[in-house]
Amino acid sequence: MSRIELDRVVVRAATPGGPVPEVTILEETTLDLTEQRVALIGPNGSGKSTLARLVNGLVEPTSGRVVVDGLDVAKKGRQVRRRVGFVFTDPTSQLVMPTVIEDVGLSLRHLERDRERRAEAAREVLASYGLAELADRSVHTLSGGQRQLLALAGVLATDPDVLVADEPTTLLDLRNARMIGDLLLGLRQQLVLATHDLDLALRCDRALLVDDGAVVADGAPAEVVAHYRATASG
Ligand SMILES: Nc1ncnc2c1ncn2[C@@H]1O[C@H](COP(=O)(O)OP(=O)(O)OP(=O)(O)O)[C@@H](O)[C@H]1O
């Protein structure tokens, strides 16, 4: 199992022209995440995405260190990004090739240099996710659920050790949200899941409640979700 460590991490952002030169997006946070499935929950704008993005270097700490399996994200960014897959809320941002098969092929470019073998491997990936019939379709003609599944298939095809998913079910209908949720929770990889779906959070092994740029509760999902519900209802 993987290990994600945050050592006194602070994230600040400049606010050009704003009343204050810098805002704190994440207050000093120290975490040691070794559980298989870690949920990040909390209100809009609380800092969940920021926390999730720190894990693969999409957000850099202003101070402190993020370490994934012993690799400092700031120093070994490329190596970390090969081990840490990322799935966004809106899969469109990560589907960049004209057709479904080409998109999976792009994900596989580091693993298989030979074009034909890569296309074959891409077809196998699609088949294993039930997407074989869509191979030659434009990604823009897919439904939201198909697109999210394709984005996930592309990332998982690279066999990452950790998967970070930032609200991956938010745009999906109930059936697709359940399908993607079940898939994520069944992965062998360590999962960091930022989500507003508290039922999904409850099925994780650990939950962190983020509020106003700080982790305010951390522990068993049932307790953390109960705490969130109690505080959210005022
Ligand atoms: N680069 C930046 N510059 C200024 N402010 C930022 C920057 N990135 C994030 N923020 C702010 O930091 C706060 C936390 O944002 P973040 O996206 O991490 O929240 P979130 O919990 O994922 O929200 P949501 O549930 O709405 O997706 C928000 O107020 C956001 O506007």
Model regions: which residues?
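The feature captures the beta-strand-to-loop junction immediately N-terminal to the Walker
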Residues: I41-P43
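Helix-to-loop junction immediately C-terminal to a conserved catalytic motif
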Residues: N56
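Conserved ABC transporter NBD signature motif
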Residues: G64-K75, V80
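Conserved ABC ATPase "signature" region
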Residues: E116-L134
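Conserved ABC ATPase signature
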Residues: S138-L142, Q146
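Catalytic Walker B motif of ABC-type/P-loop ATPase nucleotide-binding domains
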Residues: L163-D166
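Conserved beta-strand-loop-alpha-helix hinge in the C-terminal portion
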Residues: A214-G234
